[in-house]
């Protein structure tokens, strides 16, 4: 199952975030969910949404997976990409932080249960 959220970032821009979890799992308001937050936000490329055995296995073990589509990526077109590159790159980082804070504020997880992942250029989001 999944839920789609639009997270307000530092400048009011709404950042799309999809949250995936095992069917039948209640993720609302318990703050006990282990969450893996992933982002990329670079080169105008989309965060991969294809089948991923690691994410699937994690969900089967009770993890919640959150994909943050931060500025710099290609999920919302060229303007979205431009808003997260070069002198606008801080928007990518601030979008990712906003998504993490949102998951905590909405009581989906607790700071001690939140992990972050970014590969390749997405690693700068979590460094």
Model regions: which residues?
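Cap/lid segment of the alpha/beta-hydrolase catalytic domain
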Residues: 1-119, 125
């Amino acid at each position: 199952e999944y839920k789609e959220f639009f997270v307000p970032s530092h400048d009011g821009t709404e950042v799309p975030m999809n949250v995936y979890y095992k069917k039948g799992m209640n993720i609302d308001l318990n703050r006990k969910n282990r969450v893996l937050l992933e982002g990329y936000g670079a080169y105008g490329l989309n965060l991969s949404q294809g089948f991923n055995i690691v994410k699937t296995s994690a969900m089967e073990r009770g993890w919640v997976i959150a994909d943050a589509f931060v500025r710099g990526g290609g999920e919302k077109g060229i303007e979205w990409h431009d808003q997260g590159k070069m002198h606008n790159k801080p928007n990518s980082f601030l979008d990712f932080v906003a998504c993490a804070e949102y998951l905590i504020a909405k009581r989906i997880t607790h700071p001690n249960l939140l992990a972050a992942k970014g590969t390749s250029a997405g690693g700068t989001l979590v460094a």
